[in-house]
Each structure stands twice: as C-alpha cells, then as structure tokens.
C-alpha cells in the first residue's frame, strides 16, 4: 500500500491526505501496541522490541508521508522505550539490537530522549559506533519478513554496498 501511494503524483500534502484516507496511518498505533503485548513472551520479545523501537524512532524521524507512520501515542512510545531500557538494565545481550540502536541514536537521539530514554540507554547506544552496522555482515534474508524495519535496513545496507 505505502509503495503504491509513494509512486502517486501530487504534493507532499496530497500524498499525506492519500495515506490518511487509505487508513494506513491508523494501523501503526495498533501494530506497535501488539508488539508491546509481546514484550512478556520470551520467544517473541527480542524481535518485538526491535520492531517497536524502530517504529517509534522512525515515526519521530521521518514525515508521515515518507514513512507511512503518523505520530504514535506518547504512552505507547514511552512503554517501548521503557522496555528497551529494562532490557539494557537486565544486561540482555543482543548484538543486532546494539548496532541498530547505535544507528538510530546517532541519527536522532531526541527520539529516545523525548520518550524517557535514560542515561543508561544513552551509554548503551553510544557503546557501539554510530556506523557500526557497516562492519557487520547483514544477510538480506535476515531482514525479510520484518516489516518496515526490514525494508528500512534492506534499503540502507543496499546503499552502503
């Protein structure tokens, strides 16, 4: 849906209205809430956190007409950042989350600060170089089926090759 609307003609304002009419904007708050519900499931929590963090960060960084994500509810965003902080506090090891977070934080730390990111989270994000993902082999198939997170990282890594 987003791809077809992006290809459409019109000003950014018109594209924004098209996305609004499509109902796409209304779906992302529910998607992020569904990820939040998975935070307590040991088998799904790690991926749910990565996807939710990405969506919170991306919604703060890119205009809705570019990302397809309208502003998310503050309470939902805070719940995501609180869970991320809790994982860091518990010392959960996740190299992929580390280099993803370093990139997000380097590109837009304010998105984390806005929703209650702590100094502990800042230290964690800064422990990996901002461009640390460039030194990691990111297999394209590891990004498949991961929604906007996968599409974003696929495009970013393709541009780096």
Residue ranges and their predicted role:
Residues 19-34, 69-82:
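Helix-turn-helix repeat elements of alpha-solenoid scaffolds
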Residues 1-16, 41-66, 92-110, 133-138, ...:
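Amphipathic alpha-helical repeat scaffolds of TPR domains
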Residues 36-43, 87-93, 127-129:
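Solenoid-like repeat scaffolds
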Residues 21-43, 47-48, 52-54:
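Non-catalytic substrate-recognition and accessory regions of acyl/acetyltransferase enzymes
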Residues 159-161:
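Alpha-helical solenoid scaffolds in eukaryotic macromolecular assemblies
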Residues 72-77, 116-135:
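TPR/TPR-like (Sel1-like) alpha-helical repeat modules
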Residues 31-34, 83, 117-124:
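Alpha-helical solenoid repeat scaffolds, predominantly canonical TPR units
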Residues 64-72, 112-116:
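Short, flexible/disordered intra-domain loops and linkers
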């Amino acid at each position: 849906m987003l791809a077809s609307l992006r290809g459409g003609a019109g000003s950014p304002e018109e594209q924004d209205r098209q996305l609004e009419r499509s109902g796409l904007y209304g779906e992302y708050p529910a998607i992020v809430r569904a990820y939040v519900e998975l935070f307590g499931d040991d088998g799904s929590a790690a991926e749910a956190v990565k996807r939710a963090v990405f969506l919170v960060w991306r919604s703060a960084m890119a205009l809705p007409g570019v990302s397809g994500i309208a502003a998310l509810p503050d309470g939902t965003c805070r719940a995501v950042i609180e869970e991320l902080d809790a994982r860091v506090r518990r010392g959960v090891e996740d190299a992929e989350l580390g280099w993803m977070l370093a990139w997000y934080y380097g590109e837009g730390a304010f998105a984390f600060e806005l929703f209650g990111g702590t100094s502990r989270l800042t230290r964690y994000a800064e422990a990996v170089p901002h461009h640390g993902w460039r030194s990691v082999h990111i297999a394209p198939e590891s990004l498949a089926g991961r929604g906007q997170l996968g599409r974003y990282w696929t495009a970013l890594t393709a541009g780096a090759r």
